[in-house]
Amino acid sequence: SKAFDGDYKTDGYNQVMTTMDEFNKITQIMYDEGYVMVNLYDLADIDENGKMQAKQVYLPKGKTPFILSQDDVCYYHSQDGDGIATKLVIDEEGKVRNEYVQDDGSTVVGDYDVVPLIDRFVEEHPDFAYHGHKGIVALTGYNGILGYRTDISYQTRPDDLNDDKKAWLDAHPDFDLDIERAEAKKVADAMKAEGWTFASHTWGHKNMSTVSMERLETDTQNFKENIDPLIGGTDIIIFAFGADINNGGEYTGNEKFEYLKSQGYDYYCNVDSNQYFVQMTDEYFRMGRRNVDGYRMYYNPDMLADLFDVSQVFDPSRPTPVPPMNGG
């Protein structure tokens, strides 16, 4: 496969990605087991007094709610040629699909990533989506969003513009930032109408546990200026690297939290790999996430056993052993 072609990116894809075949099998198994997609706003919401309040989810007996989320839905330059879609588009029927560039340079439109795959599945199985609610799409901004080059840096071309962006701009001399942003907003609007929610994954994929306050503030403003207008704003932050701003205790008094809260963020999600972790105060709703990827399936199938049997879904095209993290 193109993702597992032995280049320097192969190990990373093997560790932190899920193949289409795996994803489709997982979706079918979880549906068959009675899982139903809900969103964060189904679980808790800010009341008229500005306080976070728990809500009730009503499902038929035998059904289990879960939240689906996908990070980095930006179609980075670094992924070109690796068997990954290039952008999300709207087809002639008004459905959200992917554009994919084939080896000969021609483009095809189809369902090659989480959003259109779930959309097609829910068309056939509407009871998989509670009130039509689907997953959360977490966005960075440094290469733009949803495959559109929406960041201001593509227009201003600062001195520190990286080689990926320079090469893309050289190949697209007719680039127009306003057109890219308008197209991205059109797709984002269509996704929201289909039940998708957007979250910040930080503009620059920053590790929020280690980043300085100054960098955090700059990054947050970059997100607000470049992405919020396209997605209608968001009050959810899904931490890049899964790295939280503290080690599990309440956020109250945490300088980074106080700043993010002041910027309108009410929902915070890390990656802790537990079956579930929820923490709620008047000020925020916090939830852990589980990574369903090559690393977790290969090394810790037991940590996913309540969702699906890894032996039924693990893609034989994956090189094994899956490389350990940090080369360890």
Predicted features along the sequence, with ranges:
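Proline- and acidic/polar-enriched loop/turn elements at helix boundaries
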Residues: 42, 203, 272-273
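C-terminal active-site subregion of NodB/CE4 polysaccharide deacetylases
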Residues: 1-38, 53-60, 64-68, 79-80, ...
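Membrane/wall-proximal cationic-aromatic binding patches
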Residues: 36-37, 43-51
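Metal-dependent polysaccharide deacetylase catalytic core of the NodB/CE4 family, i.e.
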Residues: 1-6, 10, 50-52, 59-66, ...
